[in-house]
């Protein structure tokens, strides 16, 4: 595996010794692919692997950020990328009653279904559970002098809202309090 890939030069701008800068689009894709499988790329780079990897991650994040800015509305961007919160009773889906699915606005991953939604009276869409494939990330949040648990899309890192322990007890007691701006209804 390593021998095959180490003989595959993908850089468009190698130095005199054939080492890659790690900055071309194909380099970045390759570096991130190796990182995703938990390996170092066997290609020799001009900079140390850690620096090349960090550059690739930063470049990818910058590209994604620009894509999000162009595709999302201001409130969608502020909520999902900057962990903002929309005002209660203002979001598009807080009172949604139709049957369907709720997807991450950034990546389209299925997060919730209408069967999981209930009226908590809080002014944000509330769900007692997440879809079995959602794998929503839960992160301790001590901002604003409070203790909460933030929920994020584990696929694209979009801020969704918070989870609380005041949901329906017969459904597990959880309340996913989700910003309408972070989801799409289909």
Regions found by a protein language model. Give the residues of each.
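Nucleotide-activated chemistry modules centered on ATP-dependent adenylation/adenylyltransferase
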Residues: 1-59, 67
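A short Gly-Trp-Pro
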Residues: 60-65, 69-186
């Amino acid at each position: 595996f390593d021998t095959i890939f180490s003989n595959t030069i993908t850089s468009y701008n190698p130095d005199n010794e054939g080492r890659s800068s790690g900055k071309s689009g194909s380099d970045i894709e390759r570096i991130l692919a190796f990182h995703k499988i938990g390996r170092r790329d066997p290609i020799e780079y001009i900079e140390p692997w850690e620096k090349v990897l960090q550059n690739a991650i930063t470049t990818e994040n910058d590209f994604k950020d620009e894509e999000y800015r162009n595709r999302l509305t201001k409130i969608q961007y502020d909520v999902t990328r900057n962990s903002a919160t929309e005002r209660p009773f203002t979001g598009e889906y807080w009172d949604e009653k139709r049957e369907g699915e709720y997807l991450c606005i950034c990546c389209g991953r299925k997060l919730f279904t209408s069967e999981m939604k209930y009226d908590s009276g809080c002014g944000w869409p509330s769900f007692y559970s997440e879809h079995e494939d959602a794998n929503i990330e839960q992160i301790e949040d001590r901002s604003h002098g409070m203790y909460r648990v933030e929920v994020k899309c584990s696929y694209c890192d979009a801020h969704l809202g918070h989870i609380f322990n005041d949901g329906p007890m017969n459904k597990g007691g959880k309340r996913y309090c989700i910003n309408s701006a972070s989801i799409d209804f289909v």
